[in-house]
């Protein structure tokens, strides 16, 4: 059996890879590891709207309660809400059933510790070890078996918390919200209406068969159209579990995670709230983002791709904002994970405080053209580019030519016999040529 836990919990095609049996075993092993049998654990369980979430929830809760865990079921709710409610309800852990932005046939199971952080690798390894080795676990009977309790206040608790993360109402703003037929449908329309905004909700029904299909943060085309049609101030697109946000300005242009982070970081710095004047992002954030931050005296630290690496760096350095171009943004003083609703509120509150349109705010950075070319290289040779002097010299030469207004990024594919060559810079034709020549050189040298 391959490793169960990826960078974002256990994920796979529901009922085929992520089966009810596996969900049951994860529940049992998770309940045991979180307490090592020392006390009766309390676990918050939430889910997104996809069809398979009910099936997996029943199996997971059966596993948890069979080890004596008390389960607080919070229903269809955003992933970041589970992280927050785990802390609020003083639970031992939280579990979210969701495959985030993935297609409907997928689902996932993600654990949070009692502080609302994703489980550290060593605890995930321990859960996996128990499942793989079929370790014998306690079998409580009678009153030793746990129960499931449905929370009737979870959505209200989360909405009130979200309101507390900004210091203004949103009266006067007209907002189109795309809920991706997902978990934000239960929160976002209510939240923004209660804050005084005029709300036009799209894809806001809990239709599991439509989650993320032609809508949400990965497909914002319909939202762009609706913002212009309704003459709205902005559009907000969440993904299936609302841990990420992509915005649309009043002209119908996309405002991605890089732009949102730039807007928020510049605003935070002006208020003295940007810790160490630093933002954490991944290697995929555009060079234009880095240049915009530098112009405002803000440092950028880059990590590997994946929000868990961003979060690790934020905790290590004590930084207050970090995220990904995809719209997965963490405001660590507010929540322990990416939270699309918090990101949306921060953006709207900056518009309210400054009186500026979103297109004006987004003009703080220019997205530089980006070219991606694949070099075909055998899997066993993919890491060798690091040792080749000619390749290293060529990369240095290209970056020198761009004089700080461009960059070269080399990333071996994790799944295919390819090395991805990405070049960003001001002149599209020039960087296209650079990327092609560098990919050709890599193929020649490594094959």
Swiss-Prot record:
Catalytic activity: alpha-D-glucosamine 1-phosphate = D-glucosamine 6-phosphate
Catalytic machinery residues: 100 (phosphoserine intermediate)
Modified residues (Phosphoserine): 100
One Pfam family from the record: PGM_PMM_I
Record's GO cellular component terms: cytosol
Binding sites annotated in the UniProt record for Mg(2+): 100, 239, 241, 243
Swiss-Prot/TrEMBL keywords: Isomerase, Magnesium, Metal-binding, Phosphoprotein
GO MF terms, alphabetically ordered: magnesium ion binding; phosphoglucosamine mutase activity; phosphomannomutase activity
Protein modification: Activated by phosphorylation.
InterPro entries: A-D-PHexomutase_a/b/a-I (IPR005844), A-D-PHexomutase_a/b/a-I/II/III (IPR016055), A-D-PHexomutase_a/b/a-II (IPR005845), A-D-PHexomutase_a/b/a-III (IPR005846), A-D-PHexomutase_C (IPR005843), A-D-PHexomutase_C_sf (IPR036900), A-D-PHexomutase_CS (IPR016066), Alpha-D-phosphohexomutase_SF (IPR005841)
GO-annotated biological processes: carbohydrate metabolic process; peptidoglycan biosynthetic process; UDP-N-acetylglucosamine biosynthetic process
The enzyme's E.C. designation: 5.4.2.10
EC category name: isomerase
Organism domain of life: Bacteria
Cofactor note: Binds 1 Mg(2+) ion per subunit.
Cofactors named for this entry: Mg(2+)
Assigned protein family: Belongs to the phosphohexose mutase family.
Its job: Catalyzes the conversion of glucosamine-6-phosphate to glucosamine-1-phosphate.
Protein known as: Phosphoglucosamine mutase
Lineage: Bacteria, Bacillati, Bacillota, Clostridia, Thermoanaerobacterales
């Amino acid at each position: 059996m391959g490793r169960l836990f990826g960078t974002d919990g256990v994920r796979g095609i529901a009922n085929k890879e992520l089966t009810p049996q596996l969900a049951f075993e994860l529940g049992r092993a998770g309940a045991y590891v979180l307490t090592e049998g020392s006390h009766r654990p309390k676990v918050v369980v939430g889910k997104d709207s996809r069809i398979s979430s009910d099936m997996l929830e029943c199996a997971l809760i059966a596993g948890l309660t069979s080890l004596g865990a008390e389960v607080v079921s919070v229903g269809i709710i955003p992933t970041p809400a589970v992280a927050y409610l785990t802390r609020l309800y003083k639970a031992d852990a939280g579990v979210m059933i969701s495959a985030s932005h993935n297609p409907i046939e997928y689902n996932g199971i993600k654990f949070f510790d009692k502080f609302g952080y994703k489980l550290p690798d060593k605890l995930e390894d321990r859960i996996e070890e128990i499942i793989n080795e079929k370790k014998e676990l306690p079998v409580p009977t009678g009153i030793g078996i746990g129960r499931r309790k449905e929370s009737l206040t979870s959505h209200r608790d989360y909405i009130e918390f979200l309101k507390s993360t900004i210091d203004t109402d949103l009266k006067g703003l007209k907002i189109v919200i795309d809920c991706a037929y997902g978990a934000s449908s239960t929160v976002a329309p209510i939240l923004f209406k209660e804050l005084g905004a005029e709300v036009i909700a799209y894809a806001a029904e809990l239709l599991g068969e439509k989650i993320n299909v032609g809508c949400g943060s990965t497909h914002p085309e319909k939202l762009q159209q609706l913002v212009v049609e309704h003459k709205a101030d902005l559009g907000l697109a969440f993904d299936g579990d609302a841990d990420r946000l992509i915005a649309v300005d009043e002209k119908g242009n996309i405002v991605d995670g890089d732009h949102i982070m730039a807007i928020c970081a510049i605003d935070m710095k002006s208020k003295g709230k940007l810790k160490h004047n630093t933002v954490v992002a991944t290697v995929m954030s555009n060079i234009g983002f880095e240049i915009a931050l530098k112009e405002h005296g803000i440092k950028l630290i880059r990590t590997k791709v994946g929000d868990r690496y961003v979060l690790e760096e934020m905790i290590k350095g004590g930084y207050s904002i970090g995220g990904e171009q995809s719209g997965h943004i963490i405001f660590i003083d507010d929540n322990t994970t990416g939270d699309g609703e918090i990101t949306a509120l921060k953006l709207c509150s900056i518009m309210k405080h400054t009186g500026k349109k979103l297109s004006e705010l987004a003009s703080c950075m220019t997205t530089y053209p980006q070219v991606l070319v694949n070099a075909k290289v055998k899997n066993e040779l993919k890491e060798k580019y690091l040792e080749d002097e000619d390749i290293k010299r060529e990369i240095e030469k290209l970056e020198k030519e761009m004089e700080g207004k461009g960059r070269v990024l080399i990333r071996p594919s994790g799944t295919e016999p390819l090395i991805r060559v990405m070049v960003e810079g001001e002149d599209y034709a020039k960087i296209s040529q650079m990327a092609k020549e560098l990919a050709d050189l890599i193929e020649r040298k490594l094959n």
